Design a protein with these regions (language model features):
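Structural signature of nuclease core domains in nucleic-acid processing machines
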Residues: 1-216
Length: 216
């Protein structure tokens, strides 16, 4: 999701921006050269961004139980039902999908009390949250933010937020730092929206095949 008017005049009552990819806009870390290109998705035809979008579309519309049983068959269904084009389907390496569905993270999702996918939220934040975003040039007024979390699930002792990432990275620390601000805001604002405590914010890296906890 792209920024929407991130540098509104400070005299305005409020500004509005999207949280997704906040780290890239703020410039928290220097990205490795070509880091935005998910190398394992590279195939002739689609751009790297389109291939990453195809992976997210799979994760958005697939049946989790069906994908866990047979990721390739579920890909065929998504193409047959026109959630994905043939070109998009060809860009997805289902071994990456299988790694996710064989992970301890998926076992937690499968056993959760409740699961939300593509959870969209809108919130107004004030000085407390804005204080941590001073370098983003957002000013000091009330700011409306919008975002979407790929997956949220509820366990007995709280809410867990999961964001899927296709970035090409070489270490967990690089990915964790890149999305630290984004996930921190997700943790605070989604907990407020649901009225339940958020206990963990997690990234799942398809490039690394790992779950990465992000403190918030």
């Amino acid at each position: 999701m792209d920024w929407q008017n991130p540098w509104q005049d400070a005299t305005e009552l409020s500004s509005k921006f999207a949280i997704s990819h906040l780290a890239e806009e703020v410039g928290e870390v220097e990205k490795p050269r070509f880091a935005a290109r998910p190398a394992y998705l590279y195939k002739q035809g689609l751009t790297p961004a389109e291939k990453g979008s195809a992976m997210h579309t799979y994760m958005q519309f697939c049946s989790y139980p069906a994908a866990a049983r047979d990721a390739d068959a579920e890909l065929e269904r998504l193409m047959a039902d026109r959630f994905l084009t043939e070109e998009q389907g060809a860009a997805i390496e289902t071994d990456r999908i299988r790694t996710f569905f064989e992970s301890p993270l998926y076992r937690r999702i499968a056993g959760a009390r409740q699961v939300w996918r593509e959870y969209r939220f809108l919130a107004v934040i004030g000085e407390e949250e804005l204080a941590g975003l001073a370098d983003a040039g957002l000013g000091e007024n009330r700011t409306t933010v919008q975002g979407v979390a790929d997956c949220i699930f509820e366990e007995e002792d709280g809410i867990v937020i999961v964001d899927y990432k296709t970035d090409r990275v070489f270490s967990e620390d690089a990915l964790r730092e890149r999305y630290r601000v984004q996930l921190g805001l997700y943790g605070r604002l989604i907990g407020r929206a649901l009225g339940r405590p958020v206990k963990e914010c997690l990234l799942y890296s398809f490039a690394l095949g790992r779950t990465i906890e992000v403190p918030f």
